[in-house]
Amino acid sequence: MADLRLFTSESVTEGHPDKICDQISDSILDALLAVDEHSRVAVETLVTTGLVHVAGEVTTKGYVEIPALVRDTIVEIGYDSSDVSFDGTQCGVSVSIGAQSPDIAQGVDNALETRSERSQDDLDRQGAGDQGIMFGFATTETPQYMPLPIWLAHRLAERLAAVRKDGTLGYLRPDGKTQVTIGYEGYVPKSVQTVVLSTQHARDIPSQQLRADVIEQVIEPVMHAAGVETSHIRTLINPTGRFEIGGPKGDAGLTGRKIIVDTYGGASRHGGGAFSGKDPSKVDRSAAYALRWVAKNAVAAGLADRLEVQIAYAIGKAAPVGLYVETFGTAHVPDERIIHAIREVFDLRPAAIARDLDLLRPIYARTATYGHFGRELPDFTWERLDRVDDLRSAAGL
């Protein structure tokens, strides 16, 4: 046991202040895509005590009532009364939205390939919305090809929200966080060492009652469903002793501050660009989704047991300027063959990504909580295993 490498990931519930902001930003994005699929959207949200501020840049042919969307999202999360620290029906909402910069738009609408290289390929017309680096990752640790710590942390956070909403633990409130520490031998998870769970609750709930209820109704069901024995797990429930004040009253929140929660829990590197509130022309989002698709299919194809893929773009240029893989010593073919196979099987120009993953749809609000990756939902097209055979063939397997 002393030789185990301990690795930890965290998640948060939908009532966490930063996640409130992500959900508001993505709900606005969805509403705009529903009325104009070519909307250009970059929306940031800030929440604090009694106030929501929405700012950003939007270019669209449609119209949405942003204050109403904000309030509906907050109430749906569960903040509908001052008794739970925030009230979506009464809070102030301010909106500061401008148009996308024409300097950016000209590079997205008319990429370098068509302006300078005279390309006639329609997929070369759309340039990347910004420069930057993005990463995708997959591992054989779980059936979902996700790292086990973040996968369990998300499931605990989901369960925490579920028992609040269905009344099983009706005294819980929307804000909460989870954290899971796994003991590894190499890259193989061997045991769950520690679970930390903090949950907002109603006044005057005895800490021992909350602890017993959370272990019985949240931790044990999630761990048992994952085939994890719970008797040896160290559990820390509300370690401060009290968590009555939560949500924006306890901490200000901001879109894009949970980028490690949104991705792989720290098991993979991150390029720094957040997802929520951004339409698919922003490669921060669309390319990160595409690289999850790439990595998951490559691992499922047996090219490696653990794979990280990096891509880089230049603003206003369609084709990526860099592609790199890291296999952590787990590759079953040379890394050069993996890169060759990826280039042969996947078109990673922004327009091709949006086409192949069907991204010009209002599908993003659901991504804003409990992870953008690892949930095999119908609209999460980047989780499909539809290029496995092509990759095996391209890699010579």
Curated annotation (Swiss-Prot):
Pathway per the UniProt entry: Amino-acid biosynthesis; S-adenosyl-L-methionine biosynthesis; S-adenosyl-L-methionine from L-methionine: step 1/1
Binding site for L-methionine: 57, 100, 251, 282
Region (Flexible loop): 100-110
Binding site for K(+): 44
Cofactor note: Binds 2 divalent ions per subunit. Binds 1 potassium ion per subunit.
Highest taxon, organism lineage: Bacteria
MF-aspect GO terms: ATP binding; magnesium ion binding; methionine adenosyltransferase activity
List of residues binding ATP: 16, 175-177, 242-243, 251, 257-258, 274, 278
Enzyme nomenclature, EC number: 2.5.1.6
Localization annotation: Cytoplasm
One BP term from GO: one-carbon metabolic process
GO CC entries: cytoplasm
Keywords: ATP-binding, Cytoplasm, Magnesium, Metal-binding, Nucleotide-binding, One-carbon metabolism, Potassium, Transferase
Cofactor needs: Mg(2+); K(+)
EC category name: transferase
Function: Catalyzes the formation of S-adenosylmethionine (AdoMet) from methionine and ATP. The overall synthetic reaction is composed of two sequential steps, AdoMet formation and the subsequent tripolyphosphate hydrolysis which occurs prior to release of AdoMet from the enzyme.
Subunit description: Homotetramer; dimer of dimers.
Family according to the record: Belongs to the AdoMet synthase family.
NCBIfam families in the cross-refs: metK (TIGR01034)
Protein name per Swiss-Prot or TrEMBL: S-adenosylmethionine synthase
The organism of origin for this protein: Leifsonia xyli subsp. xyli (strain CTCB07)
